[in-house]
Design a protein with these regions (language model features):
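Conserved catalytic cores of very large enzyme subunits
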Residues: 1-369
């Protein structure tokens, strides 16, 4: 949009400058240049390059105060990273203590050891809400069975049954994503090697391999999960309105979702919905005229015309909007988000990439939500 174009104009390469933290021996690395970087950001007040600061138990108070002064400008910098959490997390991935202490921030928010790692961050973006949508359609999208069948949602009698269906859809879709990522990873190694970059990454020359072939000392693949707040809110709405308070039947909720709560669909969504209806009618042996197709598409564009149905759809939407939402320190909703995020992370860790490394999850609760 206009605001984004104004604020992030130009060709940003997502360079990220890191200050503070500690060196390989565990000694504080804050120096005069760290303070100058903060002062420069205060003068320019530009969103790029990104500027990150590493904070730990040995960070000087003067540096913390200077960081806070930059934060107070409202420019959105610096980003703060907690060594006490990140260093043990990197070590749990097989990174040595000395290397973990010297991590830098790559791109937006991803920590890794510079000059020794091929992390392939942003390898893919996983929509946490997609499995929820597929639960309602029993794995069908636009008339095609694109995922596993988890049962007719209207036959589910407990939230546990519904939630298990969500987790099954999530796990299956993660598997599809991993297969696609690994195919691309293999293609990169065969078709687009990066010899100059590889010369600067430790072990590539020694192994005689580019980073795409697994020459780096550390190899990871990091697909990002996003939409976790919306996912938690969606699961909470189903649990509360359908199963706990029984204010809405599952059939009503499914129908309301199909019709976008009677508000009409976008032209692209209306076209896709119309195609699905026509395909299903054809499978049933029923022919449709061009005029009928146009009427179906018009119905999706304008929304539900029946006043009683439209009123009920609006009631359901109002009930959903009035429910508590993620991010308000409500334990039950937060636990849903945490559980799904944990499933995402643990499922990814089961997979290996063609470079001999492991998958590790990233989560973007804000940037891509």
């Amino acid at each position: 949009d206009e605001a984004s174009s104004y604020g992030f104009a130009g060709y940003s390469l997502f360079q990220n400058l890191t200050a503070g933290g500690q060196n390989a021996e565990g000694i504080d690395a804050t120096n005069d240049l760290s303070f100058l970087c903060i002062q420069a950001s205060m003068h320019t007040q530009l969103p790029a390059p990104s500027f990150s600061v590493r904070i730990w138990n040995g960070t000087p108070n003067e540096f913390l105060i200077k960081c806070a002064e930059l934060t107070r400008t409202g420019v959105g910098l610096p980003a703060y990273y907690n060594d006490e959490v990140i260093i043990p997390a990197l070590m749990s991935r097989g990174v040595t203590l000395a290397d973990a202490r010297e991590y830098g921030i790559i791109g937006c928010v991803e920590p890794q050891k510079p000059f020794k790692t091929d992390g392939w961050h942003d390898a893919a973006f996983f929509n946490m809400c997609r499995p929820l949508e597929l639960v309602f359609s029993n794995g069908v999208d636009k008339g095609a069975q694109i995922s596993i069948k988890t049962g007719n949602v209207e036959d589910m009698t407990t939230f546990e049954e519904f939630y298990n269906a969500y987790k099954a859809q999530e796990t299956y879709m993660i598997g599809l994503m991993v297969n696609a990522i690994n195919a691309i990873d293999t293609a990169h190694s065969e078709r687009v090697p990066l010899p100059f970059l590889s010369c600067m990454v430790e072990d590539c020359v020694k192994e005689g391999k580019t980073v795409q072939e697994g020459g780096a000392h550390y190899n990871f693949t990091g697909p990002q999960g996003f939409g976790i707040a919306n996912m938690a809110d969606g699961l909470w709405a189903v649990k509360t309105l359908v199963f706990d308070e029984k204010k809405v039947t599952m059939a009503e909720l499914k129908d309301a979702l199909i019709h976008n709560y009677g508000q009409g669909l976008s032209p692209k969504a209306a076209k896709n919905a119309t195609q699905e209806v026509v395909i299903n009618l054809a499978k049933a042996g029923k022919s449709v005229t061009e005029s009928q197709v146009a009427d179906i598409c018009r119905m999706f564009l304008t929304g539900e015309q029946d006043p009683a149905k439209r009123k009920r759809y609006e009631e359901i939407l109002d009930m959903i909007n009035e429910l508590p939402k993620y991010g308000n320190d409500i334990e039950e909703i937060d636990l849903l988000a945490r559980d799904v995020a944990n499933i995402y992370a643990k499922e990814l860790e089961k997979h290996k990439n063609p470079r001999g490394g492991m998958f590790q999850a990233g989560l973007y609760p804000v940037s891509a939500n």
